[in-house]
Amino acid sequence: MALKTWLLCLLLLSLVLPGASSRAHQHSMETRTPDINPAWYTGRGIRPVGRFGRRRATPRDVTGLGQLSCLPLDGRTKFSQRG
């Protein structure tokens, strides 16, 4: 009988704990300061990744895009020393 009571308590506890953690997460989302301006960070060398998202790569950030080539991997390829 004590084992059944113990298992019932564990079951009830497992049902209660996920609800408490989700409420805590929602609460932390509500306490953000709404007056933060992402434009303030522009030109200052600061990248706030967590709040405003990751920076997307632009074509000017990618160097050597036209220099990519495919080389065969059969071992018979002679590489030029000219670079």
From Swiss-Prot:
<dbReference type="GO" id="GO:0002021">
    <property type="term" value="P:response to dietary excess"/>
</dbReference>
<feature type="signal peptide">
    <location>
        <begin position="1"/>
        <end position="21"/>
    </location>
</feature>
<feature type="modified residue" description="Phenylalanine amide">
    <location>
        <position position="52"/>
    </location>
</feature>
<feature type="propeptide">
    <location>
        <begin position="57"/>
        <end position="83"/>
    </location>
</feature>
<keyword id="KW-0964">Secreted</keyword>
<dbReference type="GO" id="GO:0002023">
    <property type="term" value="P:reduction of food intake in response to dietary excess"/>
</dbReference>
<keyword id="KW-0027">Amidation</keyword>
<dbReference type="GO" id="GO:0007631">
    <property type="term" value="P:feeding behavior"/>
</dbReference>
<dbReference type="GO" id="GO:0032868">
    <property type="term" value="P:response to insulin"/>
</dbReference>
<dbReference type="GO" id="GO:0007186">
    <property type="term" value="P:G protein-coupled receptor signaling pathway"/>
</dbReference>
<keyword id="KW-0732">Signal</keyword>
<dbReference type="GO" id="GO:0001894">
    <property type="term" value="P:tissue homeostasis"/>
</dbReference>
<dbReference type="GO" id="GO:0043434">
    <property type="term" value="P:response to peptide hormone"/>
</dbReference>
<dbReference type="GO" id="GO:0045444">
    <property type="term" value="P:fat cell differentiation"/>
</dbReference>
<protein>
    <recommendedName>
        <fullName>Prolactin-releasing peptide</fullName>
    </recommendedName>
</protein>
<keyword id="KW-0165">Cleavage on pair of basic residues</keyword>
<dbReference type="GO" id="GO:0009749">
    <property type="term" value="P:response to glucose"/>
</dbReference>
<comment type="function">
    <text>Stimulates prolactin (PRL) release and regulates the expression of prolactin through its receptor GPR10. May stimulate lactotrophs directly to secrete PRL.</text>
</comment>
<dbReference type="InterPro" id="IPR026194">
    <property type="entry name" value="PrRP"/>
</dbReference>
<dbReference type="GO" id="GO:0005179">
    <property type="term" value="F:hormone activity"/>
</dbReference>
<dbReference type="GO" id="GO:0031861">
    <property type="term" value="F:prolactin-releasing peptide receptor binding"/>
</dbReference>
<dbReference type="GO" id="GO:0005737">
    <property type="term" value="C:cytoplasm"/>
</dbReference>
<dbReference type="Pfam" id="PF15172">
    <property type="entry name" value="Prolactin_RP"/>
</dbReference>
<dbReference type="GO" id="GO:0006629">
    <property type="term" value="P:lipid metabolic process"/>
</dbReference>
<dbReference type="GO" id="GO:0005576">
    <property type="term" value="C:extracellular region"/>
</dbReference>
<dbReference type="GO" id="GO:0006112">
    <property type="term" value="P:energy reserve metabolic process"/>
</dbReference>
<dbReference type="GO" id="GO:0048483">
    <property type="term" value="P:autonomic nervous system development"/>
</dbReference>
<dbReference type="GO" id="GO:0005148">
    <property type="term" value="F:prolactin receptor binding"/>
</dbReference>
<dbReference type="GO" id="GO:0005184">
    <property type="term" value="F:neuropeptide hormone activity"/>
</dbReference>
<dbReference type="GO" id="GO:0040014">
    <property type="term" value="P:regulation of multicellular organism growth"/>
</dbReference>
<keyword id="KW-0372">Hormone</keyword>
<dbReference type="GO" id="GO:0042755">
    <property type="term" value="P:eating behavior"/>
</dbReference>
